[in-house]
Amino acid sequence: MRTPARYKRFTNWRSLATAATAALMATLLTPVAAHSAPRESAPVYSYENAIRESVWVDTKLDGDSDGKTDRVAVDIVRPREPAQQGRKVPVIMDASPYYSCCGRGNESQLKTYDANGDVVQMPLYYDNYFVPRGYAFVGVDLAGTNRSDGCVDVGGRSDVQSAKAVVDWLNGRAKGYTSRTGTTKAKAGWTNGKTGMIGKSYDGTIANGVAATGVEGLETIVPIAAISSWYDYYFAKGAPLYDSGPEWLSDYVESPDARARCAAVQQKIVDGAPRTGDWTKFWTERDYVKDVRKVDASVFVIHGMQDLNVRPKHFGQWWDGLAENGVDRKIWLSQTGHVDPFDFRRAEWADTLHRWFDHELLGYDNGIDDEPMADIERAPDQWVTSDVWPPRATDTVSLRPAKGAQAGVGTLSLRTGSGTETFTDDPRQDETDWAAQIDQSTSAKAGFTTKPLTRDVRLSGSSKVTVTATPTTSSAHLSAVLVDLGPDTIRDYSASGEGISTLTDRTCWGPSTTGDSSCFKVTRAKTANVDYTVFSRGWADLGNHASDAKGEPLTPGKRYTITLDLHASDHVVPAGHRLALIIAGTDEGLIDPPSSTPTLALDLARTKASVPLVGGAAAFARATSGSSYVTPDATLDGIGEPRATHRVPGGTH
C-alpha cells in the first residue's frame, strides 16, 4: 500500500505505470468524461445466470509418480453478460486444501456440485458479492485434495505450483482441460489475466507462496492469518510448538485416493521435518520470506494479534520484508485469535476489500491507496489508523531487568541490572500462571515490571529478548512474554471463538441461489475483563544458542546466550498500567517441554528486551518518571489458559 503523499513513498513499476496511465487519460478525457470515470464496481450482472464450469490445469509436476503430470481442479463462477459481449474480466482466486475435507469460513462450508460436476455451492461470500460486480471467482483444489491429482506437500513446490499454474493458465501460459483425464483443452479467453489471490490461513499461505514466485499476472494478494515460513509454524528456534509435524497435516487434508497413493511423499515429509527442530532443505523450500524480493503483487495483510494458531511472527517478518522491498501494502491488525475479518468487522471488511480489488484489478481511482496504511483494533470493536506501520517515530529501545526486593520479582527500566535470578521449568504452568502472580515470588518464572506509567506507551512492531542463562541440565526451553499489567476489557481470544461469538441471525452479501446462499451468521465480540494482557510472546530451545538452524546438548553449569524472537504486535500500555517482561521455561499449551526439567540462572547484566517503542527511549523515560515501583501482593485475573488449539492452519472454531 503506498503511503500518503505527504510521506516519501517507495516507487516501483506499478506506481510508475499507474502514473503514466493517469497522465494519458487526463489528456484524452473531457472534463465530463473524467468526472464520470467509475470509482466503484456495481452489481449489474446476474449471479443466478452466471457461468459455472470446471477446468483441470496441468501443473507440469508428477507428485504422485504415476507417470502423468498432475492436474488440479479449478471451479469457476463468472458473469455471463461480459462473456456474451466479448469483454474480459479479472479474477479473484482462493486456492485451498480444505474444500472437501474441512470446510471454509466460520460455518465450515464445503464445495458442492451438480450432476454435471459443476460447482453449486462455492464456500464463502466472494462469488456472491463479486461476480455481479464483474469479477470471476475461481476456487482451486490444491494437488492431492478434493478433485485434483498429485499429493499434498504442505507448502512446498506442489502446493505452490497448484495455484501458480492456474495464474499461468489464466494468462495463456499453461494448459487446461475440460476434464481430469481427457484431452479436450480449455482456454481462459474470458479473462484479462489480472488475478487477485485471497484466503485465510493455509489458503492465504499459498497466496504468499505464489506471490514469492513473482508470477506475472498476479496483481494483488490478500493473505489472512497466513503463514510466511512453515518452519515457524512448527518450531520456534528449535522449540517444538506442536507434538506432531507437517506429515499429520498432509494426511489430514488429502483426499482418500491421494492418501492411498502418496505414501512416498508422506515419508519425504517425515524425513525432511525432523522433530529435533533443526532447519533442513525441507524448510528452506517452504520459507517464502527468503523470496520476498520477488513479490510484484500488492499485499493486503490481515492478522489477529492474539492468533495462537498461525502466530503473529508470520505477518511480522513478511511485512518487514515487503517494506524493505518497497511493495505496495496495507494491513489490518485485530485483537482476535485465528479469525477472518468477515467475522470481526464484517461491513467495513466487505467495503474495504471491494475497494481494494476495484483499485488493484479494475484500476479504479477510488483513493484507497491514499488512505492510512494500517487499521489497528485498540479495544473490542474500537479501531484506530496509522498512516504508516510501524509509525515512523518507532525506535528499538533496550529495556533491562534488575533485581527487586523479592526473588523473581524485579524491575524493568533503561538501566542495566546486575546479579542473577533463578527459576525452574514447570511444564504444568503457562503464561497466565506467571502473569497472574507477577508480583509474587514463585519458582517457575522471573518477572520484571516498570513503574506505573505516567503516560501511555505504544509498542509497534516486533520485539526481541536476549537471555543469558546457565542451565542445570542438558536441555532447556525458554519463553519470554510482554505483559500489560492493569485492568482492561479485551477480546477473549482463549475462548472457543477466539474473540467472537456466533449468533443465529444472518446478514446477506450478494444474491443467492438455491444451492449457494450469500447469508451468513452474525458474530459479535466476545470479551473478558482482565487485570493483565499478554500481548507478545516468543520461545526458543536454549540448545540453539549457537545457531538458529541446529541445536546441540547443553553443558550443565555453562552460561549460554540466545535471542528469542517475539511476535509482532501493536499495543498501547496506558498511563497507570505497568509493562512487564516475564522469562520462564515451558509455556504449557504453546510449546512442548524439554526432555529434562532444568533450573536456569539468568545473568541480568546480559539479559535485555529490545522493544519497538513509538517515540523511542525518550518516550519511555518520560512515561516512567515521577512514579515509584509498586509490588502489590495480589493474584491477578486474566483470560483462560492459552492453547495452540489446532494443528491445522485454518481449523474451524
Go through the PLM ranges and name each one:
Residues R87-P97:
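Short beta-strand element of the alpha/beta-hydrolase
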Residues N146-A165, A174-Y177, P341-W349:
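Catalytic nucleophile-loop/oxyanion-hole region of alpha/beta-hydrolase
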Residues A42, L61-G63, G67-D70, G103-R104, ...:
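Accessory cap/linker subdomain of secreted extracellular hydrolases
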